[in-house]
Each structure stands twice: as C-alpha cells, then as structure tokens.
Amino acid sequence: MALDGNFCDSLRDGLLTSFVDASLASEQNLRAQLLANNMSGSGTKVISVLEQELSRCQQFDFSVAFITMGGITPLLQTFKELETRGIKGRILTTDYLQFTDPRALEKLAGLSNIEIKFFRTEEAGQAGFHTKGYIFDQGQLRSIIVGSSNLTQTALTVNQEWNARLVSAAEGEFARQIQTEFDALWEHSASHPLDDVLDDYQVEYERTKAVRQRFFSAEPKLSAELSFREIRPNTMQKRLADNLLALMQKEDLGGDISVPKKGLLISATGTGKTYASAFALKAIRPKRALFLVHREQIARKSLQSYRHVMGNDYTYGVFIGQQQETDRDIVFATMQTMVKHLNDGPFSPTDFDVIVIDEVHRAGADSYKSIMEHFRPKLWFGMTATPERPDGFDVYGLFGHNILTEIRLQQALENDLLCPFHYFGISGLEINDKDYELKDFSKLVSDDRVDHILKQSDYYGYSGSRLKALVFCSSNEEARLLSQKFNARGLRTVHLSGNDSQSAREEACRRLALEAGDEALDYIFSVDIFNEGIDIPEVNQVILLRPTQSPIVFVQQIGRGLRKHDTKEYVVILDFIGQYNNNFLIPVALSGDRTYNKDYMRRVVATGTQVLSGPSSIHFDAVSRKRIYEAIDSARTNTITSLREPYRLLKFKLGRIPSILDFDVHGLIDPIKIFEACGTYYAFLKKMEKDGEDFGEMDAAAQKYLSYLTQRLGNAQRVSEILVLELILNGEHDNLKSAFIANFVRRFSSNPSEAHLQSCERILTSNFWRTQKEKEDNSNCAVIEIEEDGEWRAAGAFVSTLSANQLFNQELKDLIEFIKIRYELTYEGGYGNTLLKLYERYTYEDVCRMLDWSRNITAQNIGGYFYDKSSRTLPVFVNYNKDDHAIAYEDHFVSENHMVALSKTKRKVSSSDADHIFKRTSEDKDNRIYLFVRKNKDDAEAKSFYFLGEIYAEGEPEPVKVKGDDAFEINYRLRVPVRNDIYTYLTS
C-alpha cells in the first residue's frame, strides 16, 4: 500500500470504525478484522488473507507452534514468488508435542529468502510454545495477525479459529511490542538455526509418530463379519438409500406394474457411488441383483464393496470371461461378457429384481441397448459422475428423467466427501494448441520441458510417505516418450494405453499404490484410460500436460486423486498451462459453475481458494493467470454453437422443452447470453427446435414487443418497468402511474423520484434511444400511453397483442419472473441512493438508464466521462490498460481506494470539466461522481464496466500535456475500496 501524508488520519479513521462506531467511513484495509474460516457466512478462509498479506509485504515474520505440509502447500506458489522478488522472511517454530512436520521445514528451508529457527522447549525449562502470530512489514505500516491458527491445513481453512488482524504504524506501541517479543524469541538461547537441530528432531518426530500409530492400532478389532456391518453411509449414500426406498414403495396408480422403475445417481468422482448403490440395495432388499460394468477390475472391486456393506445375507459372484458364477444372489458382470451370452446364456429376462449399470453415460452404445432390451427387472438403476455426453445421447431419458440424488464436485467438497486438493496453474514452456495439433514432439518431450515438469513436481510435492503420481498427456506417443525420459533420470515410471492388457494395468496400479520397495512406481503416464473407472485412492499428485478441452474430462482426471485414503491428507494437482484457446474452461471446471459467466470465471482465477469449500485451494502463477484472462476475454460464450449444447443437456434432464427459468434453477448457461445471441428466448427456441418439437407460434407484432422488452429489460438491472407490466398482465389498464407508485412504495419503502418516473415512462413508451435507426427499429413498441393529466394507460396495440397470442402472454410472464428473480439475487440493494449495484457491470446505455438520464448518450460522447446537468451526475469510465492504439491516458490505481486519472484532452485546469470534477462552484457542490472500470477492450463479447462506487477528486487539478494537448491529472479517492478479487483482476 502506498502511504501519503494523510496516513495518520486514515489510520485513525480505521481505528474509530473498528472500536468506536462501525458506521463511520474508513479504509477497509486499515480496520481491525476478525479472521475466521467462514465460507457459509463471510466467505473467508484464513489462508486467503495470509496469501494477500504475503503478496504485498516487504518482509515477514511468523511465530507458530505447529507447521505441517498441509499448511504450507497452499502457500508454496506465493513463497516462490516472494523468493523471486527478494522478499525475505523469518519463521520461528518449535518441537512442542513433536507435531511440526520436518518435511515441511525442509521444504521451507529450500527457499533462499526464508530463514527458519527451531525453539527447543526442553532447553527453555519445559515451557510450552503455543504462539500463532504473523507480522507483515509494509514500510511505514505493520499488518499483524494473532490468534489461534497454526500453519496447518485445517487451521487455515476449516477449523473454528479466531484470529485478529490489526494494523499499526511501524512506530506504534502495539507493533513495537509484538516485534520486540518476536525478536526476543528469535534470539533466545533455545532457538536454533534449523540445520543445527533438524536431524535430531527428525528422529524424535518419527519416534513420537510411531508411538501414536501404535496407540491407535491397539484399539480392539471387530470380527470381519461385524466390521462389514459397521461401515456407515456418508450423507450422499444415505440420501440415495432413502430416495430409492421411497421410489420402490411408491405405488404407480393406474400404471403397468410390469414396467420397471428407473432411477439415476449423479455423483462426483470419488464420492463412493459403488458403496452408495450397495447401501441403496441393502435398503430395498432385492432377491437378486445384477451389477454391470465395463471393466473386469471394477467388477471385482465392486463385489468386495458390496460384501463389506451387505455382509453374508447374500451370495456374490462374477460373470466375466470364463468365470461364470451364475447362481449367486448378486452377480457382477462385464458388459462384454453379458452381451456375448444374452441369447444362449444362463439368465432369463426376469432373473434379476434390480440391475445396476455403472458409468451409465456409456449406455448409448449398442451393447448396452441390447442388454436393456433383453432384461425386465423391477428397477433399472444407473450411476455416473458425468451424464452430460457430447455425442448427443440422452442419459436422463434412459432413466425416465428420474434423478434420485445429484451431487457435483462443489457439493461433494462442501460435504467432506472428497480428499482436499491444492491446484496449481503453472505456466508451461512456450507450447500452444498448434504444437499439439502438429504433434511437435521436439517441444512436447524436450529436455527443457522434462526438467521443468520434474522441478515443479518436486517443489509442490505430495502428501504421504512418497510420491504416487498420475500424468495425463495429449497422446500415447507423448506419454511413452515422457515416461522414457523420466526413467532415464532415475525415476520409476510406466506408460499405459488402451493396448495394455487388464493384468498390466492392474499391476501398474498395484505398484503405484505401494508404500515402499523397489517395485514402487513414482509416475504412471497415460492419455485417457484413467479418466474413469480405475480406482487408485493412494494417488497423491495429478499432473495435467494437455490443453483443457472439456470441463467433464478435466474433472474426471483430477478426480483420480480425490478419493480419500489414510495415506494422504490432500492431493496436489499440477496443471501446466500453455497458450491454449480453451484455457477459459479451467475456472469453469474448477468451480463447477456452468453459467459461463465471465465475471465469475475471472473471480475464480483471482481468488479461487475463496470459491471452494473446505481445505481445497486454487492458485495460478502470474503467467498462467494472464493466459487464462486472455482466453476468457477472447472466448465466445454467447454464440448459437456454444448455447446449443447446454440447451440440449437441460432438455434431456427435464424431458421437455425448458423455459427460460429452468436455466438458472439448474445452474446452466446464463439466459442473458441467449438474449444477446438471439434477442429473445422465443427466437432461440426457433433455432433449437427447427426440426424438433412444436412449441407454438407468435405473430410479428408479438415478436417485436417481446424483442424490445427483452433487450431493454432482460438484464434485470431494475424492476420498475416490470411492476407496470405486471399490472397490465393482471388486467389493470388505466391509472397505471398511480398504481405503479403505490406498488413501488410497497416494494422499496420509498417514493420514486420524478426523474425515475420520467425514465420509466421513456422506456415504456419506446422513447429512449440513441440514433434515428434505433427509433425506427423500436417504433410501435409502446407499452403505455400518456394521458393529458400525465396518467398512464395501457397501449391499445399492446393489449390487443396480448389478447391475441397466448404464447406471447406466457413468454412475457416467464421473462418477468426471470427478471424479478435475477434482480433479487444480483441487483437489489443499490449503492447509496442509486439503483447501481457495486461490482456489477454496466454498459454506457445501462448507466444512462440507471441514473435516470433523459437521453441515451452515444458511446463516443459519453466515453471518458459525461456530466448530466439535470441529475448532477458525472460517471467516469476508465478503460484500464488501454491498447497501444488508444489515446495514451495513464489512468491507474495506486491502491484499492486511490486512482490517478487524466481528463479528456484539450481541457485546461480552468475548464468547466474541472469545475464539475473538483466541485468548485456552488452549482457543482452537490455533484455525484461515479467510477466505472473495465479491463481493456479485449473481451470479445462484453463492453460493460464494473461499477466501483462514488469517487471524489482530492487536491487540485494538475496540468499535463497528452500528445501536445492540454489535459489535467486528477487524484480520485474511492468511498469504498475496491473488492480484492476485482482489484486483482483489473490490475494484474
């Protein structure tokens, strides 16, 4: 943070807000703050604040009792960046309770900028050491965190922890006290340089660890049969069992009892779908069941899972190749063997009460169709993590659109069903899409690339006793050659492909899972055979060496490491990000957000750890972050091609044509992208259902009205006009202005201003336009007419169109409902006395409307800033990081609440512009200046600006020259500091 002469006043204001009156305005960064892990409330994790503080400090000191690998791994990228910048740090820890992990200390000691000392409690007279303090030197400022959080994974992310973040001038009493205390402990005779004591402590740590393991392993064991029955379902598995039992107990009144029931489980990879199905079948107690899989290895593991859950109440067997145990109660079969013996085999169509199909997204294949046509069970039960198929097959329809339970990656993390992951987006070497397309192996398997991969794999490490990594490549040849190069460097690796036998795959998996020994593998290289089905819970590192082409495949591949196992606390995901067009899919996949909202994508990149529940974290280095931002900017997410797939998937899921409301309910593509692409949802359906279902027709007048209202109101930024439309749809055609005012007061507890009434009037009479062409295009779109006394009445043409077309009625009602819901979720609660919402995005036209201007000003005139005399508002529009061809303004943030900007050219410090901005005249003293910023102009779709609140000009205008023309510099202060994720995105 850049400090100036007002620092003491700002610090005083922060203290007054913190400890005297919370309503007083002050800089957020200078207030005292309670830091707790509270994702459901404030959305914070202690780890995120530590990262922020480290990234802006000039030096740091930590004194913590406990340090573990899980605690430092999420900080490794930040520590590496600090090393590059020469930012030094001191870390003091202790042997207290032999809890601190020596591996973590070794990892930190490998950084040249960090000095570590180790406090020996016995030398200090058996005194305990339980400090948790973090001191960040920011020049004249000290940011200090003290409380309960050690450097451990759970303390920094999920535990109930209380920490206070306090800010002090460097010479302040509190800062001096805590620094003095740290320095005293640092220089204490019991504090030793790490190198002097690490070997001895390693022995002590392992000895204590062994004692703990013996203690826990000494607990009495249950018999094998009893222990099977003691396995308890997790939250997802219990919900599924309850829902399936309810389905089987439900009577289909008037239905055909010979028609089997159907149900679908959608659950993220690693959440325990096989166990879930076993618990579900245990609940409904079928006489016989068939479990169908596509690989022998999965069938045999599934049999063991069922036996663990259901015990000896059933007999179990397999139907695989020559091993055909057909007389068992529950049979586990591969699809290949079953298809081979459908006609001459031992199973009749009614032999099984329940048939479970694992990885049911494969069921579009002819072999699965043959099986489903042959058998007639009482229940078809399908399981998959990814029902969305790019081949057009409708998995949902196959199971009657009956989803018994659905839990995706984010929900699974929230429910602690998966192993936490720490994802690192790392810039690859200069590799792009073309290199993969041309299979340029000279780059893909070069020694430089191999060295780079190994260096990162070693630095970011793993959880557990040794490395057990899966590496996903773009081709088998790349995987084969990389495996060879790794082996040549003394590592133990294999390459697997679809050509390898089942036994070879099983052997490789066994070797990777080993805890020790000469047989143990370090890495397995493959392309896609590990995407699904094969289960190695011990995997503790996943490396992605290919472009992200699909969020589905991305989640499948990182999911190979997400299964929980006793040998690991977390899994490390290393994603080597080249210059790929589809990099924007990475934040989509990590967040699980399928709306393709670009702002949310950017937020994931800027502050990814904060969007994930639990201990998991997301980190990008500077280069990879830049590459993803560029991909987001250039991505086309509102084209017909990009919208077709989510529409198809939602239609499959629902079993009908979706309404515009369904997209938000099911978290799919943002409907506003549909409006941008096609004008209206009706026009979109015409394209989607061109050769499909008939959903009705709308005449030209109705289409024109729907298009006008969608384009003017569909972004849901305000609902005033919607209140009028609802009155008309409810049959009220006269005295609409009075009725609207009454409804407005009920809705917002205040009267609409005269300017706002006039603004609504202009929209509803189709008189808010910029050009003559806009005026002509929107003719005959008036919803209301103005009577002589100023009252509003419904326009006759609009009422007639509503009466003549039921489909128009329904589409308009759906649009209104969508706008109301979106407004309440996104825009309600405007900033100050405006209708604008902080951190939402607005176009030039939006700003004119939201500020109730009488005119819709063209972009050329409003660009930069424009003063509206009637409303006394002056929006300032900043294109941050303009391209080389733009006028060379030097607008830039100094800090989260300070921006330096330049006026338009050919403006002197004595100009009226300066009067408006610096409020130098009596007419200007009540002016309101609002800041809108967008990141360059590179986004291929959006030309909107983030609204960052009210600003005021500080000091006096400074005259400058811009390309020889007069201009003046302005120091703007923001009333509200920019939110961290937005600030990071704009300034990175």
Regions found by a protein language model. Name each.
Residues R207-P233, D458, S463-G464, S475, ...:
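Long, largely alpha-helical accessory region at the distal end of helicase-like NTP-driven motors
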Residues K704-L709, R718-L729, L835-S944:
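Acidic, glycine-rich low-complexity segments with interspersed aromatic residues
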Residues K250-L281:
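Walker A/P-loop
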Residues P551-Q556, R560-L590:
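Conserved segment of the helicase C-terminal RecA-like domain
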Residues I403-L470:
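Conserved interdomain linker/interface between the two RecA-like ATPase lobes of SF2 helicase motors
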Residues R300, V318-F319, Q323-Q324, N343, ...:
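Conserved helicase ATPase core of P-loop NTP-dependent helicases/translocases
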Residues M1-N234, K238:
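PLD/PLD-like phosphodiesterase catalytic module centered on the HKD motif
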